[in-house]
Amino acid sequence: MDGFLFNSRPLDEYTLADSVIPTTRREVFTLSSGDATIYGYYVKQPDSLRVEPHPVIVYHHGNYGHLQYYWDRVELLYKTGADVLVYDYRGFGKSTGTSSEASMIEDATAVLNYLYSRTDVDTTQIYHYGFSLGGFPALYSAANLHTAKGVITESIFASGEALIQTGTLVNIPGSYLLKGEYNNVALAQKRTCPLLMLHGGSDTFIPFAVHAQSIYDAARQPKTLIKVDGAEHEGVPQAFGYDFYISRIRAFIRGN
């Protein structure tokens, strides 16, 4: 039942809006990750708008579709003044292969290696943003792969086990349905960088009390949890108000 986690949609080509991010500001890249090829985009601020030290946000998207589906979220992060990297997991969009817990770790490692290979990236200024499923590679990267500057999570689950229990009507252990643990509670405990958690108060798919609160309670400092009243699973930026959402993310990446 890993399809419960990986609701991917393959694409032959990406069609991305350019009203906020001009085509001249985005670079497509491909990476080898295990036996798969990973596709993504690096979105770069104009030199005239760069502020040093210059942050980079790695956006780890949710379990549906492909990066094109999340492009409006990339645009919001671009408006914070940071560079943004977004990529597709295996089997999503143009990326090849099949996703699993182990492959997500491999893909996140390949993405970080790519960032560290770029001469225009300050590797002390890398932030991870994980939405829903993307909370796992975001927290894993910060806990195990490098010294991240900070992590932002939005609408993430506590663990695969907890997700199965709250997201289905099947009352059996999650290990019968998922091949991985996806233990975000343990990763939040292990990471040492600042953590900003955003979660909708009206999220019925990943309920706040079961998931966000339990992660926050277990996580070490520094940490901040914001319950966004009225927001459903995908509705945090809208319920916040786009301008306030952008300013809150900007304050986090400028204040650490």
Short names for language-model regions:
Residues 135-193, 238-240:
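Hydrolase active-site cap/lid region
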Residues 121-132:
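Alpha/beta-hydrolase fold nucleophile elbow
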Residues 73, 184, 193, 207-217:
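Short alpha-helix in the alpha/beta-hydrolase fold that links the catalytic acid
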Residues 202-207, 234-235:
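Acidic catalytic loop of the alpha/beta-hydrolase fold
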Residues 1-32:
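An N-terminal hydrophobic leader/cap segment in hydrolases
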Residues 213-216, 221-256:
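C-terminal catalytic histidine-bearing segment of alpha/beta-hydrolase fold enzymes
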Residues 32-114:
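Membrane-embedded segments
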Residues 190-192, 197-203:
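Short beta-strand/loop motif that positions the catalytic acidic residue
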